[in-house]
Regions:
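N-terminal export signals
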Residues: 2, 8-27
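Beta-alpha junction/loop-to-helix N-cap segments that form part of ligand/metal-binding clefts
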Residues: 28-32, 60-61, 71, 75-143, ...
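Extracytoplasmic "Venus flytrap"
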Residues: 36-38, 45-64, 68, 86-92, ...
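Short, solvent-exposed amphipathic alpha-helices that sit
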Residues: 57-72, 94, 133, 159-162, ...
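Periplasmic-binding protein-like
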Residues: 102-114, 134-136, 178-181, 235-245, ...
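Extracellular/periplasmic Venus flytrap/periplasmic-binding protein
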Residues: 141-142, 149-259, 295-304
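Extracellular/periplasmic periplasmic-binding protein-like sensory domains
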Residues: 252-325, 338, 389, 393-399
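Segments of small-molecule ligand-sensing domains
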Residues: 311-321, 332-387
Length: 400
């Protein structure tokens, strides 16, 4: 090669090198602390029920996550987001198939998951894949010793644990509390948490739990007839129950028809979402519930979130939407902390450093089991103009 040829070749190689460096720099713009802004999209897998009985909750999970993206330029950690939604369905098998499909698509993280039964079924799949899952709803109490599963919602027994001391203070000595719930994972946890916190040896909850058959979809008119007959025959001073969605609507209507007028206590899912829209004032007014969120919480994060949610969807935000909104915030912080190494393994390590989350429910942070340490609130169903609303009464406890 002549001297001229060598010079020309060096100029070409130099130009190519500069072009490559420029291209790399155009993808990563940030400071020396490792907080890049990138045009490289990050793919997130959303597992949410889009069919079956859990679809209303699945819709709320999608709305909450998408709202965070809408308020943050469609980016997480400086990256544009490709959100891939897979239908969880309503069975463990359908949920597991959704998770496996998303992992095969190369997502850097998973989020969502409505059903506790699905969560139990996908535990090993997630742990073995080492793709972090930031679950925004399902949270069975039996889910322990996990490395790659984080939860932004709660543990299923916590609503009952938070509420029980309040109920215990208000039921007189010699009184009785009837307990009723469907016979599936979340129902078992809701009852166990309440009984443990109330005091399992307390005579006021000594009567056997009234278990109902778990029904997928809308229950029939007589689905809860036997349970309600048992409640009425016991003549309790108060009722603690666990239902949600269509099951809550049917149960409360039939209970009112049967003539039950004592105080009803429940985890907040009993009156969350569209439940109150389907009930008369006489069927729901005065119900007391415990939940980690109330739409009327007075803090800056909730004012922003609730206003944007109502504007986007014309409805009151729910705890389901908040947990998913927070899952997006967790990923936003985690991806930024992960810096240039956005492998699932490095992202999972970064999630352990996200610190306090400025949530609409109030500030919270992950505890050692990877669930929120957070406040729980007492709410009462009251008239708000022409509609029924869950109105914040007080704080109950901080759990986690």
């Amino acid at each position: 090669m002549s001297q001229m040829d060598r010079r020309q070749a060096l100029r070409v190689l130099g130009a190519l090198g500069a072009t490559g460096l420029t291209a790399a720099c155009s993808r990563w713009v940030g400071d020396d602390a490792g907080e890049p802004s990138s045009d490289e999209p990050v793919r997130i897998g959303m597992v949410a029920a889009q069919s079956g009985a859990f679809k209303p909750i699945g819709d709320e999970l999608i709305r909450g996550f998408q709202l965070y993206l809408d308020l943050n330029d469609q980016r997480l950690g400086g990256h544009p987001v490709e959100l891939v939604v897979a239908d969880e369905g309503e069975t463990p098998d359908s949920g597991k198939a959704a998770v496996e499909g998303l992992i095969k698509q190369g997502v850097v993280a998973l989020t969502g998951v409505v059903s506790s039964a699905v969560m139990s079924a996908i535990r090993d799949t997630v742990e073995q894949s080492k793709v972090p899952l930031i679950s925004s709803n399902a949270s069975p109490a039996t889910l322990q010793s996990v490395v790659y599963i984080w939860r932004t919602s709660y543990v299923n027994d916590e609503a009952g644990r938070a509420l029980a001391p309040y109920v215990a203070q208000r039921v007189p000595a010699g009184g009785r509390v009837a307990i009723v719930a469907p016979d599936y994972d979340a129902g078992f946890d809701a009852v166990q948490g309440f009984r443990q916190s109330f005091g399992e040896s307390d005579d006021r909850i000594a009567d056997p739990v009234i278990w109902t058959r778990y029904v997928k979809g809308k229950p029939g008119r007589n689905t809860y007839a036997a349970a309600i007959n048992e409640i009425m025959s016991r003549k309790p001073d108060a009722l603690y129950c666990f239902f949600s969605g269509e099951a809550a609507v049917v149960f409360l209507k039939r209970l009112h028809e049967a003539g039950f007028r004592k105080q009803i206590y429940a985890p907040g899912f009993l009156t969350e979402g569209t439940v109150l829209e389907q009930l008369k004032v006489s069927e729901a007014e005065g119900i007391l519930t415990s939940l980690n969120y109330s739409a009327d919480l007075n803090n800056a994060a909730n004012r922003r979130f609730a206003s944007a949610f109502r504007k986007a969807h014309g409805s009151t935000p729910t705890t389901y939407a908040v947990a998913s909104y927070d899952a997006a915030q967790v990923l936003d912080k985690g991806i930024r902390l992960a810096g240039r190494d956005l492998s699932p393994l490095n992202l999972n390590l970064a999630l352990g450093r996200v610190g306090q989350i400025d949530s609409p429910r109030g500030p919270w942070q992950f505890n050692q089991p990877r669930t929120p340490q957070q406040k729980w609130y007492l709410r009462r169903v009251q008239r708000d103009g022409q509609v029924l609303s869950n109105v914040l009464i007080s704080e109950l406890a901080t759990l986690g």
